[in-house]
Swiss-Prot record:
Coiled coil regions, renumbered to chain: none
Protein known as: LexA repressor
Species the sequence originates in: Bacillus cytotoxicus (strain DSM 22905 / CIP 110041 / 391-98 / NVH 391-98)
Gene name in the database record: lexA
DNA-binding interval(s): 28-48
Described function: Represses a number of genes involved in the response to DNA damage (SOS response), including recA and lexA. In the presence of single-stranded DNA, RecA interacts with LexA causing an autocatalytic cleavage which disrupts the DNA-binding part of LexA, leading to derepression of the SOS regulon and eventually DNA repair.
UniProt-listed Enzyme Commission number(s): 3.4.21.88
Length: 206
């Protein structure tokens, strides 16, 4: 195999590290931040040269699809990573109309998701769930289901067909959607439609 420059070696090492840590490769932006390259086109250029030299293989039809080749081969199979749809914003404050169009996809390890075809992600807007560790801008991982147990965090549609993330309680003659923010009041409803249960949270620390 053709020898690599120091920058190319740094990029290859970072890709290997992230695959071993997370089960899927880093984004172009993450690679750039790790090796000190501000331009995504420069990162793409280095990836192309790594591919030409036989160190990696890319699939242009899939995001983050990088396969490490050579002696330290690390395969990322289609079974090991699931492209989970991000379906728009949902409020964690005042309810807003649910947006169901898929904005993009986010790779998650298949091992942490059961029934991957029934999982989606939503971006949180608001601060009503901060005491549960869910903050404005976070992505929540949601498993589609139409029922919930008391105390579970759900994505629910209100009587006005608006979506919100709250803790679910079924009480005597009503439903209570409880925020996890002591300064806010619960939402009391006669009827509520559960879209899914929140099973995880992703936060970008950069």
């Amino acid at each position: 195999m053709e020898k690599l420059t120091k920058r190319q070696q740094d990029i290859l090492d970072f890709i290997k590290l992230k695959v071993q840590e997370k089960g899927y490769p880093p984004s172009v932006r993450e690679i750039g931040q790790a090796v000190g390259l501000a331009s995504s086109s420069t990162v793409h250029g280095h990836l192309s040269r790594l591919e030409e030299k036989g160190y990696i293989r890319r699939d242009p039809t899939k995001p983050r699809a990088i396969e490490i080749l050579g002696e330290e081969r690390i395969e990322i199979s289609t079974q090991s990573v699931v492209q989970v749809p991000i379906v728009g914003k949902v409020t964690a404050g005042l309810p807003i109309t649910a947006v169901e169009s898929v904005e993009e996809h986010f790779p998650l390890p298949a091992s942490i998701i059961a029934g991957a075809d029934q999982v989606f992600m939503l971006r949180i807007s608001g601060d009503s769930m901060i005491e549960a560790g869910i903050f404005d801008g976070d992505l929540v991982v949601v498993r589609q289901q139409h029922s919930a147990n008391n105390g579970e965090i759900v994505v629910a549609l209100t009587e006005d067909n608006e979506a919100t993330v709250k803790r679910f309680y079924k009480e005597k003659d009503h439903f209570r959607l409880q925020p996890e923010n002591s300064s806010l009041e619960p939402i009391i409803l006669n009827t509520v439609s559960v879209i899914g249960k929140v099973i995880g949270v992703y936060r970008d620390l950069h």
